Structures are given as C-alpha cells and as structure tokens.
Amino acid sequence: MNDSQRVSILSEALPYIQSFSGRKIVIKYGGSVMEDDDLKNAFFRDIALLSTVGVCPIVIHGGGPEINNWLKKLEISPKFENGLRITDQKTMEIVEMVLMGRVNKQIVKGINKTGSLAVGISGLDGNLIQSRELGDGSHGLVGEVTKINPEILDPLISKGYIPIISSIGSTVEGISHNINADFVAGEIAAAISAEKLILLTDTQGILKEKDNKNSLVEKTNLKEARDLIDKKIVTEGMIPKTECCIRALAQGVKAAHIIDGRVQHSLLLEIFTNTGIGTMIVA
C-alpha cells in the first residue's frame, strides 16, 4: 500500500468517524471470530479503535463452543432442539460459569491489553436483563427478554468504559435463563437508543441465493427484510438474526447490520467505509 492509498483510506473514514463520535453501537460477538486467535485479536483492536475515536461500543456475547467444550469435559451431552440448547439446571450452572467466568473475562482481558478499558458484566448485574422462560418451557432454562434495565450501563459508557455483557437474564424471582445473544443485543440496542446494531456471524450477510456469494443483499429496509423471510429467501439460522434486526429497528435503532466475522476487521470495514462488507437494514 502506498502513501496515497493510506491517505485515501483515512479520508474515506473521516466523515464516518465524525458522524458516529459519541454514538452508541451495540455489537453481538459470536461465531468463528471467538475461536480463531487472529480474528479475536483483530476484534479486540477494532473495539479499541472504535472507543479511541469516540464511538461508544457495547459488546454482547454468547459462547456456544466454549459451553460445549466444558459440557464434554464434564461428560454431559449437549442437547439441541430447533437450534436452541436444551438447558436443565445442571447445564445452566455450566452456562453461567462459562459465559460469566471465562468467556466474558477473556474478552475483557483481550480489550484491556490494547490499552482500552473494558468492564465485564452479565444480565444479572443491576438486573440488566429481566427474562422469562421461552415459549412453553420445553427448552428448560432457555429464556427470552421481558425488560432491559439499562441504568447500570450509563455510568460505564459516560466514563469511557466498554461494557462487555454475557447473555444471561433472570426472572424477578432470581431464576437464571440462557438467552440467545442476538436477541439480547437487539433488545439492549433498542433500550439505549443505539445508532447501530451489528451482528458478527459466520456468513457474509443475507444472500438472495443461499449458495451464491455474489447474491449478497448489501442494503435493505424493514419491509423488504420481512418480505425476504415471507418468501423464504431468508431461511434457517438467518431467520432469527433478521427478525432480531427487524425488532430492533421497529423500536428505534437507526440501522442494523449482519456481517461476516470471519473477515479480519469486518467491523471497521462495515462502519467506516462507503461500501461496507455485509447487509445493512434500515427502517
């Protein structure tokens, strides 16, 4: 890369940096990016850069692979139904241990090593995420969000800290639930009036043709996104991600993005370049 190209990149990013300075961006961190050391380190640096230029990133994470690893160590077979983990009490204890005690703190340490300041919390802290059991309760302690109490986030964000939130919620009676991190991210984004919701995934974004990498939907709106689901263009695991984005936009989030976390620095490419890298959905 020559000097002219470097200057061009910085010039392209400048208006986006100015536009998003002081704005909150909620990022769901998951998929392969959590397992590959190079991708993890690139993500930590990207979060640090966002914070350094004045953006307020809030990171929500799951931790499926790590949970499965610990279940295997403890000789417990993970069970899934319709893509959701069947979570009994013993499994829930492991989910809490792994998400809150290991995955969360690994992310915090990774970001802090860059010189930025991250703070790890869960949905239990400050009663941030209130929940109830999902559907008829057949998935056990799998939950859905009933209310977000974002007050605990305000002092952290205002002081320049980066909140790292594990997707555990609880009922008013104190029963913990394992909640899909995509939906937690969407609900938190809505509750804090975030500028953007960004989901890091193991796909390019929404594809019009499932196996055609050239069919990426680069930009769409709420109505078109709903149509993509109704017409079964969006299928399988992309359905809940798209629905999560739709719900967040309907509650006031300005833009939602589904991007490929397997690409290094995809976060910065989506936020700070003209073309982006994934799918952007707007109201």
Curated annotation (Swiss-Prot):
Q: Name one GO cellular component term.
A: cytoplasm
Primary location class: cytoplasm
Q: Which reaction does it catalyse?
A: N-acetyl-L-glutamate + ATP = N-acetyl-L-glutamyl 5-phosphate + ADP
**Residues that coordinate or bind substrate:** 63-64, 85, 178
Mention one GO molecular function: ATP binding
The record's subcellular location field reads: Cytoplasm
The record's Pfam families line, in alphabetical order, gives: AA_kinase
In the record, the note on similarity to other proteins reads:
Belongs to the acetylglutamate kinase family. ArgB subfamily.
Q: What is this protein called?
A: Acetylglutamate kinase
Q: Give the organism, scientific name.
A: Prochlorococcus marinus (strain MIT 9301)
